[in-house]
Amino acid sequence: MAMRVETNPLEAAYAALLENGLDGAGEALRILVNEAAKIERSAFLGARPYERTETRRDYANGFKPKTVLTRHGELTFQVPQVRSSDFYPSALEKGTRTDQAVNLALAEMYVQGVSTRRVIDVLQRLLGPEISLSSAQVSRAAAKLDEGLRAWRERPLGETPYLFLDARYEKVRLEGRIVDCAVLIAVGIEASGKRRVLGCEVATSEAEINWRRFLESLLARGLKGVTLIIADDHAGLKAARRAVLPSVPWQRCQFHLQQNAGALTTRQEARKTVAAQMRAIFNAPDRTEAERLLKAALTLWCKEHPKLAEWAETAIPESLTVFDFPAAHRIRLRTTNGLERINRELRRRTRVASIFPNPDSCLRLVSALLAELDDEWMTGKVYLNFNP
């Protein structure tokens, strides 16, 4: 008789990571969740496999596969079954907030009749070939998730010296039309040196009234001590910033400024030269040297690129505010590039649905993603040292 070798789940998960590095994280997660689900079933039954005991409530009845969309891609878990009781492992029921928000967006599209091939394909992988969903089921699940996300969006804020503001657009169904809605995002660096996602909002545009309402909501939650705002040059945001935080200086994003300069330079070779000149200005050791280099560049541009010179005379000084802050902080404060990770992840996550069924669905997914990112930042390393 052959000897049966028991595989330790922790060893199997470790082996997956050892063999494939972070690429094996999905397999490690699958192994550990499967084991956690089996342990939870044993606790529910009041008995381990094959154990005879008077405390047993029911009997194990095999497993059913379930495919879940996670940040590691599609993972198929083995869901433990029981004979006659209502049991489901909590690890698989909950999932991550972002995964739930993505799946709810698809489910909302389905029950509202937006049954595109892509939506059907994904839901069939999640729920099986026979999709059985009702509006009531989807509404209950959405309400449960929204409660926690609303609490996160409305949590108290505090001392936040540096405030980053940005927006991106998502396609949303609104009053029978498909419109581009602005997703307003605020990220801050707290006095502790940690980055935090401060809030988000879905609006019909980046008009002043929307940015103003968003900024006022941050102040109402306790945001204070802001010494610098880092943002791109947008008329609505600029007007709202002046109205709500008039005394706080503004650092214009240097990265987007360089992109704008490139559009005002016709020849490719000249574009490279202008980019190098702008980098020299931005990388200057202090404001005095930066202003000297800018003055020299403007003299050249007036002759060779008059349109660029006219624009740069007012635009570039708006990107030099950072020189009034500690040298050790400047590299973190020059651009809004730190928000690009958020935008990349949002693009990846929204690709499945492509069009949100309503603004609430869009806000739910954005909030879930940002809440998870905020958790990472809160427990991670200090981003900026205020006490060198």
From Swiss-Prot:
Q: Carries keyword DNA-binding?
A: yes
**Keyword annotations:** DNA recombination, DNA-binding, Transposable element, Transposition
- Transmembrane region positions? none
Biological process terms from the Gene Ontology for this record are:
DNA transposition
**One MF term in the entry's GO annotations:** DNA binding
Q: Which Pfam families match?
A: Transposase_mut
Question: This protein's superkingdom?
Answer: Bacteria
What is stated as this protein's family in its record?
Belongs to the transposase mutator family.
What is the stated purpose of this protein?
Answer: Required for the transposition of the insertion element.
The protein's name is Transposase for insertion sequence element IS406
Species source reads Burkholderia multivorans (strain ATCC 17616 / 249)
Q: What is the lineage of its organism?
A: Bacteria, Pseudomonadati, Pseudomonadota, Betaproteobacteria, Burkholderiales
